[in-house]
């Protein structure tokens, strides 16, 4: 078995090495990850300059690019003659819950694997401390997949509470919650007196009730959310067709 690992925190991040260590005795591990932190890169690709790739250790590659670049390169070049059985992204340093998944490079790396036909899972720790807890559930889910393959071709988004293992309740299948709009920009001055701006903190949860990923994490459960790439609002197709015919086309 062969597993491709990537992330958005960078090739030297603690999370991706905790992920690798949890699985080395189960599969051949290949790491292809950004050369630096690329959090928030979403599904962006590098188009205006070439990708520079460095092998920094056995089966470990650093890419001057985004998480999506990394998986695209790995599956279309590095591993094209022997594709991996799984693409795993993470373990992210921080949760990817609700609509955060739209910005997440961690989820995007797994999504690229999904686009290219490989079962893919994104893993995130809701903090930066208990990577051993996250690694335990990574291993559990991969072993379950080996014994009984995941019954869907959907991309999976998994978030693990940042708690000691004995304080985690188990795994719960969830839907995405939602946040309020992010807080306003933070305006500052640079040393030369020019205005600079930082993104404000994320908005508070708006939809975090039972059944959501937010609710699971808050209660000490691992959240497992199947995601789909189709962004079509299928329930609106009929009303939009009616609107177009009646209001636009006469």
Curated annotation (Swiss-Prot):
Cofactor binding, note field: Binds 1 divalent metal cation per subunit.
Compartments, record wording: Cytoplasm
Single GO cellular component term: cytoplasm
Catalysed reaction, written as an equation: a ribonucleoside 5'-phosphate + H2O = a ribonucleoside + phosphate
Chief place where the protein resides: cytoplasm
Matches recorded under Pfam families: SurE
Coiled-coil positions: none
Enzyme Commission number, as recorded: 3.1.3.5
Record carries keyword Cytoplasm: yes
Any one Gene Ontology molecular-function term assigned to this protein's record: exopolyphosphatase activity
Cofactor(s) listed in the protein's UniProt record: a divalent metal cation
Annotated binding of a divalent metal cation, by residue: 8-9, 39, 92
EC main group: hydrolase
Domain of life: Bacteria
Record flagged with keyword Nucleus: no
Family classification: Belongs to the SurE nucleotidase family.
Free-text function comment from the UniProt entry: Nucleotidase that shows phosphatase activity on nucleoside 5'-monophosphates.
PANTHER family hit by this protein: 5'-NUCLEOTIDASE SURE (PTHR30457), 5'_3'-NUCLEOTIDASE SURE (PTHR30457:SF12)
Name under which the protein is recorded: 5'-nucleotidase SurE
Gene name linked to the record: surE
């Amino acid at each position: 078995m062969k597993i491709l690992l990537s992330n958005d925190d960078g090739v030297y991040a603690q999370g991706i090495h905790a992920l690798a260590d949890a699985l080395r005795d189960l599969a051949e591990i290949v790491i292809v990850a950004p050369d630096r932190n690329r959090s928030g890169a979403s599904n962006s690709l590098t188009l205006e300059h070439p990708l520079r790739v460095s092998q920094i250790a056995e089966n470990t590659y650093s890419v001057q690019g985004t998480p999506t670049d990394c998986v695209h390169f790995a599956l279309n070049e590095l591993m094209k003659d022997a594709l991996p059985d799984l693409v795993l992204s993470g373990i992210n340093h921080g949760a990817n819950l609700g609509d955060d998944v739209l910005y997440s490079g961690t989820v995007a790396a797994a999504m690229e694997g999904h686009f290219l036909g490989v079962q893919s899972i994104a893993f995130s720790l809701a903090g930066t401390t208990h990577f051993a807890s996250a690694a335990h559930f990574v291993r559990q889910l991969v072993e379950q997949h080996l014994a009984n393959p995941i019954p869907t071709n959907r991309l999976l988004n998994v978030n693990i509470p940042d708690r000691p293992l004995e304080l985690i309740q188990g795994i719960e299948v969830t839907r995405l919650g939602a946040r309020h709009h992010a807080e306003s920009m933070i305006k500052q001055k640079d040393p030369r007196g020019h205005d600079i701006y930082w993104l404000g903190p994320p908005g508070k949860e708006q939809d975090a009730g039972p059944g959501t990923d937010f609710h699971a994490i808050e209660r000490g459960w691992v959240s497992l959310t199947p995601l789909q790439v189709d962004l079509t609002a299928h329930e609106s197709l009929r009303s939009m067709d009616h609107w177009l015919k009646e209001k636009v086309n006469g």
